[in-house]
């Protein structure tokens, strides 16, 4: 059987089978490897592979899962460690480049709404989603003493316990093959498996090509913002005092500057537009080099009475170098900000998939004008598009930011909230009665509070990791386009994610597309000598 670090696909990751197969046959605990796009059920039958082969660019995260199974005897005092990776010419990727998490299962007590279409929820049950880190993300020191700890752990009879492994390939790594090992220790014995990594001859940009804006309501500390950015997702707003650090170390490239007009889906009223000088003062306080935007109104496509006020807001912010972002379908009434320049009153149109499909003509019109279009996701709005709720297949999270966004020329992504936690978020992801009588497990909570695991800020969910991998897929396509191979790049992208309806549900197909992109870029970069992404590889606008 063969896997990659992100999905099941032939010829990429080959596992040794002898150790785990023998263990299962004897009814003793087993260890095996699973790809990152595979959810390991609490009682799934054990797999059979123990060795890992990965391929990745510099500056890229690549992930896999180390799974322990208690079989008929259980497993106690389990820990997992990873060695340095040794590479060409004495090069070393230190073990500190790996981040490990114990996956915590959460219970979905009732299914997300099921529209009976091509993309249906998987229903009630226990899902691995929350990630308990082994080490502090800032200091790298082991965590201990919190109410939830990663290691050591026990595995009950017949149950599984996966460990999520992130490898961040250093931006300074030389291309070539690197090898090392992981070791699982327990009271019942130890197992060591091999890790092989091929570092491709190109580097992902520190600031992702795909813009994003994900909102914190209560947990937006600097530590929380850095955790989001580590996962290639940008917070909505940032403090000007923190921006230099976030730009240098975490790839921040855009920020919302405020203010909000007060208009949203339930309120067709806007406050008067701030003056040009007010917008200029706000803009001047931000760090140079950031794309500045104002998320001025939310879901107001039904509020035609607001169009004159929207134009005034846009005209004033445009004179201050700020872009206007509104979640609504394009409408010709807002194709001008009233200045006579031809610039639209909305620079960044943010659409749900169903909104996009219902306004394709208008989307083409605003893109032709030079506006940009982003996507967003919430609840269950249709029967066909990707969903970001816990009981949907992992492919849902990866396909939207990556291949669908590239195929539809979308340049950004928005999510309304990442920290809408119930009173006990580590043990309850359900919310029936909050948005409707239905349950939308995990809606508005892509991160978990850090206090319970002993870290500042927040910790990621597996869903956030899959979104991150999609953002990296977007970069792969963007880099290949920048190397003069746009037709090939788009052909590969559209083979798996052509639009909101016809995207693949096959994790192996996604990994095959990524592998083809990576190998092609690696060959082109090796032939032409440069080792970083070509200039001009960013999408226009944003």
Question: What is each residue range found by the language model?
Answer:
Residues 9-20:
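Bacterial N-terminal signal peptides
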Residues 23-27:
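Boundary at the C-terminal end of the N-terminal hydrophobic targeting segment
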Residues 28-192:
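Ligand-binding face of N-terminal immunoglobulin V-set domains in extracellular IgSF glycoproteins
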Residues 190-273, 277-299:
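An acidic-aromatic substrate-binding cleft motif
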Residues 220-224, 239-246, 271-282, 328-338, ...:
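Alpha-helical scaffolding within the catalytic cores
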Residues 278-303, 314-331, 338, 411, ...:
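Catalytic domains of carbohydrate-active enzymes that cleave complex glycans
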Residues 333-354, 389:
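Substrate-binding cleft/loops of secretory-pathway carbohydrate-active enzymes
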Residues 368-398:
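Active-site clefts of carbohydrate-active enzymes
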